[in-house]
Amino acid sequence: MQRVTITLDDDLLETLDSLSQRRGYNNRSEAIRDILRGALAQETAQQHGTQGFAVLSYVYEHEKRDLARRLVSTQHHHHDLSVATLHVHVSHEDCLEIAVLKGDMGDIQHFADDVIAQRGVRHGHLQCLPDDE
């Protein structure tokens, strides 16, 4: 292992210390290593041609004009990526969908971009995991 020095502004350091305490890290180095591993795994997983898994989560307004129909159409267009989908009614206006995806990470990223870009979709997030086999 090598020792490196980094410079962080006060707010970022405070956030790191808070995260470290909440997650039970013994020191900042452990927290930074874990964060870095996660970021690098995301970067690797999102490369086109890489096979992997992903979880796409998003909130959308179900009564927004034609949005539900457009989302279903997008999902059917990418049916080969979908492993499972969970649909939750979070309020009178909003729904939460969580899709478990498997396949080429470039295709998954394209699908996620299509969904998240729809007008009426909020809080879209894609979490990628490389297939290590």
From Swiss-Prot:
Q: Which GO terms describe its biological process?
A: response to nickel cation
Disulphides: none
The regions listed as transmembrane in this protein's record are none
Transport as a keyword?
Answer: no
Q: Which molecular-function annotation in GO is an example for this chain?
A: sequence-specific DNA binding
Please report a single Pfam family linked to this protein: NikR_C
Has UniProt tagged this entry with the keyword Repressor? yes
Q: Tell me which cofactor or cofactors this protein depends on.
A: Ni(2+)
Annotated residues that bind Ni(2+) are located at H76, H87, H89, C95
UniProtKB keywords = DNA-binding, Metal-binding, Nickel, Repressor, Transcription, Transcription regulation
Cofactor binding mode and count: Binds 1 nickel ion per subunit.
- HAMAP family xref list: NikR
As for what it does, the entry says: Transcriptional repressor of the nikABCDE operon. Is active in the presence of excessive concentrations of intracellular nickel.
Subunit: Homotetramer.
Q: Which family does it belong to?
A: Belongs to the transcriptional regulatory CopG/NikR family.
- What name does the UniProt record give this protein? Nickel-responsive regulator
Source organism of this protein record: Enterobacter sp. (strain 638)
Q: Which gene encodes it?
A: nikR
